[in-house]
Amino acid sequence: MTFPGDTAVLVLAAGPGTRMRSDTPKVLHTLAGRSMLSHVLHAIAKLAPQRLIVVLGHDHQRIAPLVGELADTLGRTIDVALQDRPLGTGHAVLCGLSALPDDYAGNVVVTSGDTPLLDADTLADLIATHRAVSAAVTVLTTTLDDPFGYGRILRTQDHEVMAIVEQTDATPSQREIREVNAGVYAFDIAALRSALSRLSSNNAQQELYLTDVIAILRSDGQTVHASHVDDSALVAGVNNRVQLAELASELNRRVVAAHQLAGVTVVDPATTWIDVDVTIGRDTVIHPGTQLLGRTQIGGRCVVGPDTTLTDVAVGDGASVVRTHGSSSSIGDGAAVGPFTYLRPGTALGADGKLGAFVEVKNSTIGTGTKVPHLTYVGDADIGEYSNIGASSVFVNYDGTSKRRTTVGSHVRTGSDTMFVAPVTIGDGAYTGAGTVVREDVPPGALAVSAGPQRNIENWVQRKRPGSPAAQASKRASEMACQQPTQPPDADQTP
């Protein structure tokens, strides 16, 4: 499914978006992991138009570099045209057409950069209908329960499109009309150029309205056609953050449903958020409160959640990830993570490995079958296969000026509360005793013990904390011990 070879597309993204009340340009606000402009350009790129032009104005210095990045991502050229003064949508189209050669003779699709649910099928249907009826212009329309803010479609008694009137210029009776302009058009370029040359700014906004082209072309006797979109969300625009949240929720509902239909169990769609670039394998179960963001990849037969957020994380088949926050990491096949686990960028857990409760890992590789069960920080480390890191262990990776790495071999067993003061290497098959502070390399098969014999300082509390609850408790315990009767010796032990 592609556009005909003579089709150019203009994306209007020059508006300041004042109703967003934001320092971020409106078209760069995000939903489902992409900016609004990115959603629109992805949909258009699927149809491979001959030319794709984005018209920028407000904050073009911030938006243009991102358009360039999107062009690289999409593998195609995207031109940028500049509207240097905010003189209306008609003027924006004139600016966009300046990027086309004067002898360009084809169809031009015009759309907005703030319609994030607009899809390739809707655009393809528009151009197909436009060509089928040989229209000078075909405009997408939809019907809204609350049409406030949209241009109204005016029709003749024969139901032909007569004009589009903007909200600010509409009469009270015209504002009752519920069929609205979706802001997406297909034009014959010659007819468009002719009509644009006759636009007037004699209106409430004192701007050149693209919508006035409809009435001009009709007065010329040209064919003006409308194509109605029943699913109004596909062409809904965003002017404020309420509308952004509403469309984000609707897009998420559609994304979740698509995964469900593909064989993924989503226990509670209302509390599950999945970005559009996320992939999930069959028979995976997603529990409530889960967010799968960015380019996260989940394998098949996994269990994810509840209360889990993964951003750009790759999860292998059959893995379990519970109450975990992770980013830019990988989890191997059959591995188990959570609950209350924090995976920071650069974490790579091997197949059948385990990262348990209250474990934080950063910039570390953990081998196949290795377990870090609980209460441990692993930073800047490489751990081999089938090792076990005891509870409350810490990889001490920062010396005050720089980060250092620790290497732990395979089949290593470390006692609870072991401190690895980097840089150190623990050889294959080595052990550490509980409470050991490892400051030097441990040879393969060795047992590292840093603590000396235990020494008890009698009556320390009584001397250092007299009268304290601890001192009183210890005094009572001592007195009770003194009152214990002495056991008489057994009869057969009497001399």
UniProtKB/Swiss-Prot annotation:
GO terms for biological process: adhesion of symbiont to host cell; cell morphogenesis; cell wall organization; entry of bacterium into host cell; lipid A biosynthetic process; peptidoglycan biosynthetic process; regulation of cell shape; UDP-N-acetylglucosamine biosynthetic process. The active site is at H374. Residues 457-495 are annotated as: Disordered. Residues 263-495 are annotated as: N-acetyltransferase. GO terms for cellular component: cytoplasm; membrane. There is a cross-link at K362 (Isoglutamyl lysine isopeptide (Lys-Gln) (interchain with Q-Cter in protein Pup)). The modification N-acetylthreonine is found at T2. Coiled coil: none annotated. Pathway: Nucleotide-sugar biosynthesis; UDP-N-acetyl-alpha-D-glucosamine biosynthesis; N-acetyl-alpha-D-glucosamine 1-phosphate from alpha-D-glucosamine 6-phosphate (route II): step 2/2; Nucleotide-sugar biosynthesis; UDP-N-acetyl-alpha-D-glucosamine biosynthesis; UDP-N-acetyl-alpha-D-glucosamine from N-acetyl-alpha-D-glucosamine 1-phosphate: step 1/1; Bacterial outer membrane biogenesis; LPS lipid A biosynthesis. GO terms for molecular function: glucosamine-1-phosphate N-acetyltransferase activity; magnesium ion binding; UDP-N-acetylglucosamine diphosphorylase activity; uridylyltransferase activity. Its EC number is 2.7.7.23, 2.3.1.157. Pfam families: Hexapep, NTP_transf_3. Acetyl-CoA binds at A391, N397, Y398, S416, A434. In the N-terminal section; belongs to the N-acetylglucosamine-1-phosphate uridyltransferase family. In the C-terminal section; belongs to the transferase hexapeptide repeat family. This is Bifunctional protein GlmU. It comes from Mycobacterium tuberculosis (strain ATCC 25618 / H37Rv). The lineage of its organism: Bacteria, Bacillati, Actinomycetota, Actinomycetes, Mycobacteriales.
